[in-house]
Every structure is written in structure tokens, then in C-alpha cells.
């Protein structure tokens, strides 16, 4: 009996990691757990991609018979991402954290000694106030075009105004429903990441654009932003739209929805808005995240420095 148990134990030890664990099933269980914990759909999608990519890498490894070999395979994977895929340091950090969390959830102890590398804290880019105005004014809304053309132009101008004046994420923008908006109070209820709702504001000009857009809509839908066929817009569509208007406005910088969001935060900070108020408007759970987004731009830094008159 003892010999049989020893033989069974030795047989299990000779099995590789992928034979001992059903990875596809573990991945599915992990994603269900993330959904139960109210992780956002985008976060779950990212985690799924990271874990599945690592699993596919492991399938080509043939020496996963103990923790040391599994650890070595993980390090080879990180090396592969850096050398061959040329990914950023921040992505390496994310991969390390996600894979470690997945292994911990699955009861696999191979990566306990792995430490996530430090993230880089590069300053996010932003547009200045004149560039934002040029971008929005690149959308020419005229009454001499077709009904569909006027609808599209009015919609596009409203999208640019909302992204900047409210600091929305593009995923939040395309998910907006008409009943989320209170034009009289100039507020929007955002269904944020992880089911964390928040209220954001918009200005008088954006309200006027909103009311004009609602009059010009040619399809009925609970969603605010629609294409010409009446379907909700996708994040990719909005990204390409902004890129086209930036080119038309002659802006040489890269312009994305996220850069408009950062410009919103940066300009509020420059105008004296308290950073905790900005944190609330952006929907950040940690103040440190807001501090990275709202790093003082170089021109403001120069102005403060010059006013100091050190010599």
C-alpha cells in the first residue's frame, strides 16, 4: 500500500505543470471570479488576453516538471515580450501582476518569489487650450448639407466637446444613454469601471450642442451616440474620427480620446481646481493616479520659475 502511494506521488511529480492542471478550465474560473468582483469588461478582457497568451507560451515549453523550471519559463516569457514583442515596461509590470494573481487564484505556488518591475512614470501628453479649440472648430456644422451630414457633424462636434469638457473615457462616452443626462443641471451619470457610478459636469456650450444634436437625431435609441444606421458608436470609430479632425486642424501631436481626457485634467489644475475635485471628476479611486495625469506642463513650470526671480 505504501509502495503504491509512493509510486503515485512520484508519477505526479514527473507530470508537467500543464498535465497537473487544467489551464483552460482554470482560466474560465478566474474570469468568472473577476466578473463577480465587479471588474470592468475592459479589464477582464485584458486579463484574459494576458493569461491566455502566457498559457500558449507554456504549451511550447517541455520541461515544466518542478517550480524552478516553471519560474524559468516565466522569465523566458518576459524576456520574449521585451526582446521580440518590444512591449513597454508598464506592460511587463501588468503581465507580471496578472499572471501572479492568476497563479495565486489557481493554487499554483511557482511564482511567489517573482517581483513586478517598477513602472515608468512618463508624463502624459496634452493639448493646449488653443489646440483644443482648433480641434473642435475643425468640425464645420452647416445647414446647407444633407440631413445625414448635418446629423453627423453635429454629433462629432458634441463628442469632441464632451470628451474635453467632461473628461470622459471613450468607453464611457459610447455607453452613454439619453436618460444618463440632465441638460438642466448640466450633469451626466457615468456608469464607470467596476460599476462605480459618478457624476460629471459639462458647460453651457456643450449643452447647446447637446440640445441641437437631439433635435437632429434620425433614429430612435436609448444610446446617445449613433451612426447613420442607428447603431451605437464603437470606441475605434471615435478614435479614428478624432484622428481625422486633428489632421484637418493641422495639429501635429497625436490626438486620442485619452489625450483629451488628460487635457481636461491638466487645464483644470492650471486654473486652480483642487486635485481632489479633479480626482472625483475623473473617477479615480486613488489620488496618486490623478497626480500622474495632472503633472504640471512645462510652460506652467517655466512661468512659475520666472516669477520666482532667483537671481
Swiss-Prot record:
Entry's localization field: Cytoplasm
Residues of the Core-binding (CB) domain: 21-107
Entry function: Site-specific tyrosine recombinase, which acts by catalyzing the cutting and rejoining of the recombining DNA molecules.
Protein name listed in UniProt: Tyrosine recombinase XerA
Natural source organism: Methanothermobacter thermautotrophicus (strain ATCC 29096 / DSM 1053 / JCM 10044 / NBRC 100330 / Delta H) (Methanobacterium thermoautotrophicum)
A UniProt-annotated Pfam family: Phage_integrase
GO CC annotations, alphabetized: cytoplasm
Keywords: Cytoplasm, DNA integration, DNA recombination, DNA-binding
UniProt similarity note: Belongs to the 'phage' integrase family. XerA subfamily.
PROSITE patterns: CB (PS51900), TYR_RECOMBINASE (PS51898)
Amino acid at each position: 500500500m505504501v509502495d503504491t502511494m509512493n509510486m503515485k506521488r512520484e508519477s505526479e511529480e514527473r507530470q508537467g505543470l500543464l498535465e497537473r492542471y487544467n489551464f483552460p478550465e482554470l482560466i474560465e474560473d478566474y474570469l468568472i471570479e473577476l466578473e463577480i468582483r465587479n471588474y470592468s469588461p475592459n479589464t477582464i478582457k485584458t486579463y484574459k488576453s494576458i493569461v491566455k497568451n502566457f498559457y500558449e507560451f507554456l504549451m511550447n515549453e517541455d520541461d515544466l516538471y518542478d517550480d524552478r523550471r516553471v519560474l524559468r519559463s516565466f522569465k523566458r516569457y518576459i524576456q520574449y515580450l521585451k526582446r521580440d514583442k518590444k512591449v513597454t515596461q508598464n506592460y511587463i509590470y501588468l503581465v507580471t501582476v496578472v499572471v501572479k494573481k492568476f497563479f495565486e487564484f489557481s493554487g499554483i505556488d511557482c511564482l511567489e518569489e517573482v517581483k513586478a518591475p517598477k513602472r515608468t512614470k512618463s508624463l502624459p501628453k496634452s493639448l493646449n487650450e488653443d489646440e483644443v479649440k482648433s480641434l473642435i472648430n475643425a468640425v464645420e456644422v452647416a445647414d446647407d448639407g444633407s440631413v445625414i451630414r448635418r446629423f453627423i457633424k453635429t454629433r462629432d462636434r458634441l463628442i469632441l466637446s464632451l470628451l474635453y469638457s467632461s473628461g470622459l473615457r471613450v468607453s464611457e462616452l459610447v455607453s452613454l444613454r439619453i436618460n444618463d443626462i440632465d441638460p438642466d443641471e448640466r450633469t451626466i451619470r457615468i456608469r464607470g469601471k467596476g460599476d462605480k457610478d459618478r457624476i460629471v459636469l459639462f458647460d453651457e456650450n456643450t449643452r447647446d450642442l447637446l440640445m441641437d444634436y437631439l433635435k437632429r437625431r434620425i433614429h430612435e435609441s436609448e444610446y446617445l451616440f449613433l451612426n447613420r444606421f442607428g447603431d451605437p458608436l464603437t470606441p475605434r470609430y471615435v478614435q479614428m474620427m478624432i484622428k481625422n479632425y486633428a489632421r484637418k486642424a493641422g495639429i501635429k501631436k497625436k490626438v486620442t480620446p485619452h489625450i483629451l481626457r488628460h487635457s481636461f485634467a491638466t487645464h483644470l489644475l492650471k486654473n486652480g481646481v483642487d486635485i481632489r475635485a479633479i480626482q472625483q471628476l475623473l473617477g479615480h479611486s486613488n489620488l496618486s493616479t490623478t497626480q500622474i495625469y495632472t503633472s504640471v506642463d512645462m510652460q506652467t513650470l517655466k512661468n512659475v520659475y520666472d516669477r520666482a526671480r532667483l537671481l
